[in-house]
Regions:
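N-terminal secretory signal peptides that target proteins for export/translocation
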Residues: 1-9
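Bacterial N-terminal signal peptides
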Residues: 14-23
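Early exported N-terminus immediately downstream of N-terminal targeting peptides
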Residues: 33-101
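C-terminal partner/receptor-binding element of secreted or periplasmic proteins
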Residues: 40, 156-182
Length: 182
């Protein structure tokens, strides 16, 4: 009697585990489709083989490892909600390649909502989201132009509160840099 009950329980647990795995796989493939549809990610993927490009995609374990380094940047405000992160930087590319990339990036970023722009020394940093301020959004893009262009794409579940926290940290760090320069 006990053995039959144990076998039934084992079978039920196996079925429940299989259902959970199918559910997880469906959720992961839905996330994969969402990423593939992102115009900013598509732009970065199309430029991946360009000379002078440094790019990195962080997700899963690699993203968890990188969270320690994020503690010193404004990104710490969103690190708990971050699912995926793309980093793309033009360092040694030809000037013409960089001009073409900037033109393509500006076309893609026109479809996003511009949230903030900071001009410091020789660099301009612009923050975009794929939604409206006040809504929940799942993609945030930090676009930096200077000698060399870089773009960081953050994917996850974000709110306006995350933007406010990032801005507060950024302002505090900017003030600290100005006082140390003097």
């Amino acid at each position: 009697m006990i053995n039959a009950f144990g076998r039934r329980m084992k079978n039920m647990l196996t079925i429940m585990l299989a259902i959970m795995m199918i559910s997880i796989c469906q959720h992961a493939s839905a996330d994969g489709k969402k990423v593939a549809e992102s115009p900013a990610v598509t732009l970065l993927e199309s430029r991946r083989d360009m000379k002078g490009i440094k790019d990195m995609k962080l997700e899963g374990f690699m993203l968890k490892m990188a969270k320690g380094a994020m503690k010193k940047s404004p990104v710490v405000a969103i690190s708990d909600n971050l699912d995926r992160m793309y980093i793309f930087a033009i360092e040694d590319a030809s000037e013409m390649d960089e001009v073409h990339f900037r033109a393509d990036a500006e076309k893609v970023l026109a479809g996003y909502t511009k949230v903030a722009e900071v001009v410091e020394d020789h660099a301009t940093t612009i923050l975009y989201i794929n939604g409206q301020v006040g809504d929940t959004f799942n993609e945030m893009i930090m676009y930096v132009t200077r000698p060399g262009t870089s773009m960081m794409i953050f994917q996850g579940e974000f709110t306006t509160d995350h933007l406010v926290k990032m801005n507060e940290i950024s302002e505090r760090q900017r003030k600290e840099r100005k006082t140390t320069k003097r």
